[in-house]
Amino acid sequence: MKKIKVLMAAGALAGAMATQGAAFELGVVAFQMSAETQARCANTVGAEAEKLGWTTQVLNSNGALETHASQLDNLIQKGVDAMILCMSKPVQFDAQFLAAKDAGIPVITISSGASPHTLFDVTPNEYVMASEAAIYLLGTINFEGNVLLQKFESNTGARIRGEVMDVVLKENPQVKVLGEHSMARTKSWQDDVRNGMSALILQNAGNVNGIWSSFDGQALIIDDILLEAGMKKGDVSLVSIDGGQEVYRRIKDPGSMMTATVAIPFEDMAAKAVDMMKQIAVDGKAKADLVPGPYLFIPATLVDKTNVDQFLK
């Protein structure tokens, strides 16, 4: 009889733990999942959370500020247990972040920038990555010649990359910027990049030695434009930041202009965000004991023809 009671108690405890695990609800929002990196990030968060038995809801804002705000508002009103946001915008959505904090909902962001209302942002060191990409590009043209720049100001990380590039160029006056395009739209960003860079490439045909873009999605479009113009690998150096199988394939491809990228381990960052959320929101560990500041930095790696085979799957 005693053995039966022990077994019943153990079963009840296991059931309670299972119920508790299943009851933990995580809201996951990516700002624009048509960007490969954001899709990788959000989908990995969802998959890792499900491994823990959590209920997850993965949302795509499709690059629309209004949609992103509404999705955050709805998750807060619903009372989810926690949120992980991929490539969000802390400045634009400060009100939502504050509302989540006031509601006792812990928030971790990924490659979004810091906010006083979130636990922290999981990110590579943008300053290190940006300087590495900038110096690499200039090295491929022997620190002289003409370049075009494709920027993006609305994302914190992309903006930092552009600002670091500007500093590097200032210290290397023998490299001239023939033109730059700043991506303004997020919902139809592919068309924005294609239209802006097509015009710059046409205007400066035959005079461009290198092209820098703030993230790989832009670089892929630029590569297509260059290929359509009849250029061959080596005619122009094309360097960007993010990493992904399509970019690696093009770096390897002798017919592509893609020269190098700085590969961010988005899957590792997403998995780390889920693990940290579990330790803080479920296990009760103090954030300060795990992450002593507003950022949790994850290392990135420059990928070019010398090591691309290590990254291709």
Report the location of each language-model feature.
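A residue-level marker of the well-folded mature domains of exported/periplasmic proteins
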Residues: 2-8, 13, 17-313
